[in-house]
């Protein structure tokens, strides 16, 4: 998929676990794992807003476009 989720990198930079993020954004660890591993087909804006608030970042910090070659 040409959209890459940088959740792992942001969690490491903030020394935060997936479980801690799950509690902060009220999304299950399973669903966050699906997103983190690039298996999600879509993300709701409300989810993106909660992730950005919890990680203190902008959407562009979390999502990157990688052209397919």
Model segments located where?
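A short, Lys/Arg-rich alpha-helix, primarily the initiator
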Residues: 1-16
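Residues within the helices of the helix-turn-helix
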Residues: 8, 19, 49
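The alpha-helix within a helix-turn-helix
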Residues: 11, 22, 52
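Short alpha-helical DNA-recognition segment
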Residues: 16-34
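Residue-level recognition of specific faces of alpha-helices
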Residues: 31-34, 47, 61
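Short, charged recognition helix plus adjacent turn
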Residues: 34, 41, 63-69
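Short, basic-rich loop-to-helix N-cap that marks the start of a DNA-contacting helix
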Residues: 39-50
